[in-house]
């Protein structure tokens, strides 16, 4: 098995990678990278030239991008059944929903940043508009407990993190929510998967890591 080192911050998407590592039962080390100068330092830029977290070092190979890291880990621990079989149609569905998430992210942040919407802009952009993207996901989750198949997968780590961030975390930090009404389908999905023991362990880690960074500040 590879030796894993995760570079992350508790208030970043790296928390989803911690959750995934715990679901996998992986052995790993964590290096906390404070926001600001440390993340743009020469030492860290040698790890990730983008100067962002998370980054996962597997032996001497560095992986970045949360979706890529989570998918890689699912493949590394086949006994955990966190990704459909490679020769299955469900694996194709997995890739479809993995790539679909970009519509949600772009459209969601457009909403947060109050980017003006119009029919002309919807025709011009290369990703789905907010209403269509989230309606597509909402309709899917109204019929399914999981993003793909009939069991929890790496995609549920990714999507739970994404939806939780938009619906619950951002408002807690004073950022206007992307939805102006209750979202029972999304809330039920978030509640279902944040009830997992590995998520609770991840939140405990995040609290401890945040306290550690505060002491270092």
Segment roles from a protein language model:
Residues 1-124, 131, 138:
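GST-like domain detector, emphasizing the conserved glutathione-binding G-site
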Residues 20, 74, 162-163, 203:
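Active-site-flanking alpha-helical
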Residues 34, 154, 206:
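Short, solvent-exposed turn/loop segments enriched in Gly/Ser/Thr/Pro and often Arg
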